[in-house]
Amino acid sequence: MSRERIKRELPPVQEHIDKLRKVIEEGNYYGALQMYKSISARYVTAQRFSEALDILFSGACIELEHGLVNCGADLAILFVDTLVKAKSPCNDETLDRIRCIFKLFPRVPVPPHLVDVSDDEDVQNLQESLGEARSRVENLTSFLRAAIKWSAEFGGPRTGYPELHAMLGDYLYTECPELDMVRISRHFVRAEDPEKFASMLVNFMGRCYPGEDDLAIARAVLMYLSMGNMKDANFMMDEIKKQAETKNPELSESDLIQFISYLLETLQRDALPLFNMLRVKYKSSIDRDQLLNELLDEIAERFYGVQRKNPLQGMFGDIFKMMG
């Protein structure tokens, strides 16, 4: 059958949307998912992308509204895949749809890991809850990573639309059972919302293990600097110091925090020898996390033109790592 004939024979899209909603409301969730995929594929084949997107957007929202995270995420990812096929530009209308889908992903408090290990039912309930939380995070991450990549390719900033990074960073922080602050920070430094990032780090300071707080702050500031973003790096440090005066006064005594403070002052002038001296003096603190050395190498290249021995080792040299 020719593409033109398919175009003519496809019915108005609202008929499918109404029919599929009824299928879900009748409880045939898996059947509805397969129908959403097959029907939208017919519209894509006919290059009626706008209507395919209408079907997939509706399906993702309805499935998520019914608590069907896996099904909703499948359709949400297919929605973004169709944006790419249609070469849809990154604009407010499409971003609004992505926001709508994002808001429908459930947020469920992660249960405390401390349970009575002698109670098999408690242990089983905890394992199930943690497994469900990981699944939600993986689904949301796949959707937003695809959306970030689409936005970067079709009119957004080279590293992806900032708000999408903010969405993903926030969800990872609040919903993931095992916090990965490096991964979370990668998104927040691209979110153009240093106030929110600073608030999150202050919150993290109140729940992390001793010795993790100064590392998280140092990584955040150095990530900003590796991108040449002095303004937000300084804002972050000032805001953290302000908050720590009452909540964590010992933070200012950390050698790593002292190093970051001196570094911010040094980068405001042409002072490569001083930069190198600071790295030597605070080497033991910097060596607590290899990522700090990698970021400092990138900062040396950006601010002082110092070539890295192997540029491919730089965390931010690979745009695909950024998407993680």
UniProtKB/Swiss-Prot annotation:
Q: How does it assemble?
A: Interacts with GET3A.
Localization (cell)? Cytoplasm, Cytosol
GO cellular component, alphabetical, reads: cytosol
* Membership in a protein family: Belongs to the GET4 family.
Q: What is this protein called?
A: Protein GET4
One GO BP:
protein insertion into ER membrane
GN (gene name) = MDC12.19
- Look up keyword Cytoplasm and say if it applies: yes
Q: Which Pfam families match?
A: GET4
Task: Read off the PANTHER family from this record.
Answer: GOLGI TO ER TRAFFIC PROTEIN 4 HOMOLOG
Q: Which cysteines are joined by disulfide bonds?
A: none
Query: Null-mutant phenotype, please?
Result: Strong reduction of root hair length.
Tell me, in a sentence or two, what this protein's role is.
Answer: Involved in the regulation of root hair growth.
Keyword terms of this UniProt record: Cytoplasm
InterPro entries recorded: GET4, TPR-like_helical_dom_sf
